[in-house]
């Protein structure tokens, strides 16, 4: 079986220094393959095209920390959730970043494209803030660190991983999670 994943979403799926795709999602997927007594390989795909690639049979299932949403359920089926997550903002430690419409007005906030974080920003703040969407969270973090963004909204575990890095040392979580019941499942073709 071919496991589809993004390979750019640490700590859940990433490419290590040996070029191997590793992370929590792959640990789960490989354990399932072992339990089913089948050989599995890993195929990476850009996030934007990962569901169309699954439906085009480029891989057999997705282990990619994918949120189970009504919109996605129209295109694919999901297993029961294997973990839950939430969305939380990060910004510079010394900033006065607050999470309310008045405080965020005029701020530039980054999120990964085609994710619940990007959707949440658009649904909750729309035109009140400048939303910048990225192909990967890593690109959003680069712009945050270079001063092109005031904050980033992403899964709290993914943000936490970046905050532990050298690049994230001057940043911190801001406020409480804004969405804290994100159910993550393995996606399958219908």
State where each predicted segment sits.
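Periplasmic-binding protein-like
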Residues: 7, 83-91, 156, 160, ...
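Short, charged, surface-exposed secondary-structure boundary motifs
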Residues: 72-74, 120-121, 141-146
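Short, solvent-exposed loop/turn elements at domain surfaces
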Residues: 10-15, 71
């Amino acid at each position: 079986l071919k496991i589809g994943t993004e390979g750019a979403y640490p700590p859940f799926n990433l490419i290590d220094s040996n070029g191997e795709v590793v992370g929590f999602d792959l640990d789960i997927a490989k354990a399932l393959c072992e339990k089913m007594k089948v050989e599995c390989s890993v195929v990476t795909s850009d996030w934007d095209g990962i569901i169309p690639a699954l439906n085009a049979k480029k891989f057999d299932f997705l282990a990619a920390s994918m949120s189970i949403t009504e919109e996605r359920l129209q295109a694919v089926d999901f297993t029961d959730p294997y973990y839950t997550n939430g969305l939380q903002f990060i910004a510079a430690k010394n900033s006065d970043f607050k999470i309310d419409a008045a405080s965020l007005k005029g701020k530039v906030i980054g999120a990964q494209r085609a994710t619940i974080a990007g959707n949440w920003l658009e649904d909750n703040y729309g035109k009140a803030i400048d939303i910048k969407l990225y192909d990967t969270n890593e690109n959003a973090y680069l712009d945050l660190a270079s001063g092109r963004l005031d904050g980033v909204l992403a899964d709290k575990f993914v943000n936490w991983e970046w905050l532990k890095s050298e690049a994230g040392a001057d940043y911190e979580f801001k406020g409480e999670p804004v969405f804290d019941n994100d159910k993550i499942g393995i996606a399958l073709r219908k």
